[in-house]
């Protein structure tokens, strides 16, 4: 993601709020919390626009992640698992290729099943496309922690998705036999 200068806060919101909402949803697993998180993030970014203007997306992302971590600490539990959100223009897919995944719901459910730290790492590394070092900086941890959390998360996602594909295969086999 290249650095882009925005002429105004309004332009920034118009161009980037949908992507920030997607990230908030993937971090929280809950549409309502994601919308609240986005609103608070944008408000804090606006209040500090003179500081944020140089790199507003990075600034807003940091606020978003910090608010998400604060929410998790306050609740003392991982995000609520959620079903696939309703489709709509205000919550786009991760990228064009993501729409082609037939098992989008399974991917979102598997992501929701990860512990908060692993979920954050996966979202930041693979959805936001941040490097290990950028992710570590954003989460205030070491690069080694990001790498180990990523490895654990990917292993768990493979297990969860293998379970899904196994149950789908059993269902298809049963349906054919009927």
PLM region descriptions:
Residues 65, 69, 139-164:
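DNA-recognition helix of helix-turn-helix
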Residues 2-8, 137, 154-178:
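C-terminal edge and immediately downstream basic/flexible tail or linker adjoining helix-turn-helix-like DNA-binding
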Residues 51, 55, 65-84, 99-100:
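Arg/Lys-rich amphipathic alpha helix in sigma70-family domain 2
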Residues 36-43, 54-66:
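Structural recognition of an alpha-helix C-terminal capping motif at a helix-to-coil junction
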Residues 1-22, 32-35:
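A short, charge-rich alpha-helical start-of-domain segment used by transcription regulators
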Residues 21, 31-48:
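Conserved RNAP core-binding helix
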Residues 78-104, 131, 170-177:
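Internal acidic/polar
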Residues 121-125:
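A short pre-motif secondary-structure segment
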């Amino acid at each position: 993601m290249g650095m882009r200068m925005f002429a105004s806060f309004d332009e920034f919101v118009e161009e980037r709020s949908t992507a920030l909402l997607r990230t908030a949803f993937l971090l929280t697993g809950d549409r309502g919390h994601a919308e609240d998180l986005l609103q608070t993030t944008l408000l804090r970014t606006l209040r500090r626009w003179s500081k944020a203007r140089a790199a507003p997306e990075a600034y807003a992302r940091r606020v978003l992640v910090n608010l998400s971590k604060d929410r998790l600490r306050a609740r003392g539990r991982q995000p609520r698992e959620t079903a696939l959100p309703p489709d709509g223009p205000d919550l786009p897919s991760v990228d064009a290729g993501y729409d082609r995944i037939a098992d989008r719901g399974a991917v979102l459910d598997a992501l929701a099943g990860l512990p908060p730290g692993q979920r954050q790492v996966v979202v930041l590394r693979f959805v936001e496309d941040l490097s290990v070092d950028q992710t570590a900086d954003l989460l205030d941890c070491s690069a080694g922690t990001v790498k180990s959390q990523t490895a654990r998360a990917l292993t768990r996602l493979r297990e969860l998705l293998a379970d899904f594909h196994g149950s789908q295969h059993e269902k298809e086999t049963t349906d054919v036999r009927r």
